[in-house]
Amino acid sequence: MSFTHGYADNHGLRMYYEIHGQEVPGLPPLLLIPGGGSTIGTNFGELIPLLADQRQVIAVEEEGHGRTQPTSRPLTAENSAGDILAVLDQLNVGAADVLGFSAGGHTAVALALTRPAAVRHLIAASTFVSRDAVPDGFWDAMARATLADMPYTYKDADRRLNPDAGHLERLFELDRQRILDFPGWSGDELGTITASTLVVCADRDVVSAEYAARMAGAIPGARLLIVPGGHGDYLGELAASGGDLRTMHATVPFLLRFLGEQGT
């Protein structure tokens, strides 16, 4: 499938984006935000053709990921939300439906909080909004993590796009520090989200289905979808799915049905 691409500038950060599919009258584009360590291809390469057949899709790569080069600033959900707003402004997109996966889900939530009018539907996939989402062992493991723990799929994709020495190491540290420093949001903050929201979680995900239900309960009117599988295979994420796309094909109709519902 052919696509167009470009960069949007935001205070020295040049965010890479791709546009797949054609504009659909009456429907905003669907914005995809990959998870940590990922590129558009590794996270959404299998999913985009299914979505772009029915919706125009804009996919981005956050700072240090893929074709978006790192700067000296930290990688945070709020910084990335600002970068994405620069993309939307450059493309004259006033509002979009947004799907953020994992750490990209943090950015999607930050976007919905930063500029509520920019997010019509929000799909928060395999993500969390508070530090109590995961046990203490998760944080201990993240603090001890090294590049050797990074999935080969991510390493290979980054080395092909960015063969210069030190880039992969910088990517890994940006992601690791981002998670370690993640503050989460209060219930009062989450209560201000105006986007129609769907919380998606797999039954063998990083967070539990019980936590996902609690997260959905904190966002006004949010819906909940629990799917079989692990962290991202239901989106065709390359490292998680290993090429088995059955869960993705079963999940997509539910996502499209939610996106087709009347927005706020």
Put a short name on every predicted segment:
Residues 11-69:
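Conserved HGGG/HGGXW glycine-rich cap/lid loop of the alpha/beta-hydrolase fold
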Residues 173-189:
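Active-site nucleophile elbow and catalytic-triad environment of alpha/beta-hydrolase enzymes
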